[in-house]
């Protein structure tokens, strides 16, 4: 594929952790945009 994906710095822990957090945050933001009622439970 791309040469950048095989470099050593791309596979380092801070880069992988940053990408993982960004992807997780994006999924949560989009999920809460379409289904916002699951964030708050007024009956509890």
Curated annotation (Swiss-Prot):
Keywords: Membrane, Photosynthesis, Photosystem I, Thylakoid, Transmembrane, Transmembrane helix. This is Photosystem I reaction center subunit IX. It is found in: Cellular thylakoid membrane. May help in the organization of the PsaE and PsaF subunits. It comes from Prochlorococcus marinus (strain SARG / CCMP1375 / SS120). InterPro entries: PSI_PsaJ, PSI_PsaJ_sf. GO terms for biological process: photosynthesis. Its main location: membrane. The keyword Thylakoid applies. Belongs to the PsaJ family. GO terms for cellular component: photosystem I; plasma membrane-derived thylakoid membrane. Pfam families: PSI_PsaJ. The chain crosses the membrane at residues 9-29. It comes from the Bacteria. It is a single-pass membrane protein.
């Amino acid at each position: 594929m791309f040469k950048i994906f095989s470099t050593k710095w791309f596979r380092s822990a801070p880069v992988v952790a940053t990408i993982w957090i960004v992807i997780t945050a994006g999924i949560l933001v989009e999920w809460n945009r379409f289904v916002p009622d699951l964030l708050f439970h007024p009956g509890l």
